[in-house]
Regions:
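Aromatic-lined substrate-binding rim segments of carbohydrate-active enzymes
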Residues: 96-133, 176-209
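Active-site groove signature of glycoside hydrolases
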Residues: 98, 151-185, 316
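Active-site-adjacent "subsite" loops/lids of carbohydrate-active enzymes
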Residues: 61-70, 74-79, 112-122, 126-161, ...
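Catalytic domains of carbohydrate-active enzymes, especially glycoside hydrolases
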Residues: 81-105, 160-166, 238, 307-315
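Aromatic- and acid-rich polysaccharide-binding/catalytic face
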Residues: 99, 225-259, 318-323
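Boundary/entry segment of secreted carbohydrate-active catalytic domains
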Residues: 31-89, 211, 283-285
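Substrate-binding cleft of secreted/luminal carbohydrate-active enzymes
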Residues: 243-244, 258-259, 276-353
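Aromatic-lined carbohydrate-recognition surfaces of secreted/lumenal glycan-active proteins
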Residues: 70, 128-135, 188-226, 273-286
Length: 378
């Protein structure tokens, strides 16, 4: 009986922890679950409908120009939440939803109801299943075959649910200098081999295969993470560089000029690819937006317009917190008859930067070129 006070303490602590956990879950998801969005797309009334035959592709084809947003696994699993995004997507001209097949913390599979994928298809929305291959990059080599088998099993599961595209992310080596014993060409062979094998199997079922790559891979060659555009061009149908301006920390100019960053990355990558469709992931979050002097909606719209001007295969907005209010506002700016605020100045700055780069390449440096070069040293 001497342990009773201790047991009471543990019981009270457990109750407090449970209360806190429930509070956090409600704060994160409760409002969206209780509120019925205006104009929500129709969803099945049954909570757990019987499994149906996966919907056929019908007339829905891979978009010639992707206009998409990313949704994490929780949003993808909840019918009411997903229906709200489908409704907003249709209202604003979004034709693609990238849905996580795994949770974002432990990368464990999270079951997406088949009816949710069918909802996308029936509303003309292209559903893409995102699968993280090597969380935060490959840390051991050779690659465990059990891991490869697990990822391919998840891809097959996505196909059975009706997904029309499998998007592999984190298909790279860790960006930390580990595994130095693995040579550059071997890294390429591993990454491209996995994707080629996946495509060989999935394309036989009419499934599109895509891969996310670092934004810098669009601009460089011989990247140690094992990604190169020329090799991936033969391994997948769609390549998606994650060209978030906030991540180009070596260039103040690229951080402060989202139009230039996306336009430059898009044009260089476009000219290097011969087969694969090029789609850019663009930044839909606040990180390092301030140096641009733009509001977030305008910042996003500049990136969208850069993709249009570069004549590539579209864009997908990334916001891990699912805060897409600024993205909807950006799309309103894109649809408006009046020019996007600051877009002409951004185009002019891009043209000047391109001329400066040409001057550097030919060795004819001007004072303006020298100033810009020094400004790029972050």
């Amino acid at each position: 009986m001497k342990n009773i006070p201790g047991l009471r303490y543990l019981a009270i602590l457990a109750m407090v922890c449970c209360f806190f956990l429930n509070f956090m879950i409600y704060r994160e998801y409760g409002a969206s679950l209780q509120a019925k969005p205006e104009g929500t797309a129709q969803v099945a009334q049954k909570a757990e409908p019987e499994a149906a035959v996966p919907p056929s592709n019908g007339e829905l084809r891979r978009p010639a120009e992707y206009r998409g947003i990313y949704l994490h696994n929780y949003s993808a699993r909840m019918p009411k939440i997903l229906a709200d995004y489908v409704t907003k997507a249709k209202q604003h001209g979004v034709n693609t939803l990238v849905l996580d097949m795994q949770d974002a913390v432990y990368f464990r599979p999270g079951e997406i109801p088949q009816q949710n994928v069918a909802l996308c298809l029936s509303n003309g929305i292209w559903p893409v299943a995102r699968i993280v291959v090597f969380p935060y990059g490959l840390k051991e080599y050779p690659v465990p075959q059990s891991l490869i088998a697990d990822r391919m099993a998840l891809a097959r599961k996505a196909v059975s649910l009706g997904f029309r595209e499998i998007q592999f992310d984190y298909i790279r080596f860790e960006d930390s200098g580990r595994l130095r014993q693995v040579g550059q060409e071997e890294r390429y062979r591993m990454v491209e081999g996995f994707l080629s094998n996946a495509r060989r199997e999935l394309s036989a079922k009419g499934i599109v295969v895509s891969a996310d790559v670092f934004g810098r891979v669009a601009l460089n060659r011989h990247d140690p993470i094992g990604q190169r555009l020329e090799g991936l061009d033969n391994a997948v149908d769609v390549i998606l560089p994650m060209a978030y301006p906030s991540h180009y920390t070596w260039s103040r100019f690229m951080i402060a000029n989202p139009y230039y960053t996306l336009y430059k990355s898009s044009v260089v990558a476009r000219d290097r690819l011969k087969k694969a469709q090029l789609v850019m992931y663009i930044q839909g979050f606040e990180m390092r937006v301030a140096p641009s002097g733009l509001s977030l909606p305008v910042y996003i719209a500049h990136q969208m317009q850069a993709c249009v001007d570069a004549r590539i295969g579209g864009w997908i907005v990334w916001n891990a917190a699912q805060n897409y209010g600024p993205t909807w506002d950006a799309l309103k700016l894109m649809a408006a008859k009046s020019p996007i605020p600051g877009i002409e100045a951004a185009r002019a700055a891009t043209a000047r930067e391109e001329r400066s780069a040409e001057s550097q390449a030919t060795g004819t440096r001007t004072p303006a070129t020298k100033k810009r070069t020094e400004g790029n040293r972050a």
